[in-house]
């Protein structure tokens, strides 16, 4: 598949809540550096830590104002640094999700493991968020599960090079 395959201009107005858990991973052999679009410079080897995961809940509602609002909480608390990263990420992927133009997002994310502990929390959080966004989109498309899985991997990687694992 190529990048163009993942662009969805379909739009809709609806509200709802989606939730995903994504496992983290820890690298045995790390990649060093990235190419364009978060593609790792070299191969790496990592282990999935299925009992260490990020839980992300996304509530989506038709937007209230002319600009989209994206609210982010980590562990139930506002976190300005993480919110800015999430906003930047969502702006970078909005061409792949037509519904982002007319919806506000309320995102709450938490890990069941310590943040900044050497476990790839950015990978699991981007994977969980990407999975939520693809699930929202799947409410209006007829994409099959195989396509949705590939899109989740593609969108996850744009947020973190390790997230598509």
Task: Place the predicted regions along the sequence by residue.
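ATP-binding N-lobe of GHMP and related small-molecule kinases
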Residues: 1-117, 131-145
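Short, electropositive, low-hydrophobicity segments enriched in small/polar residues
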Residues: 31, 126, 165
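Short helix-coil transition sites and intra-membrane helix breaks within transmembrane domains
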Residues: 117-123
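Short amphipathic alpha-helical face segments that pack within enzyme cores
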Residues: 124-132
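ATP-dependent small-molecule kinase catalytic core of the GHMP/sugar-kinase superfamily
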Residues: 143-165
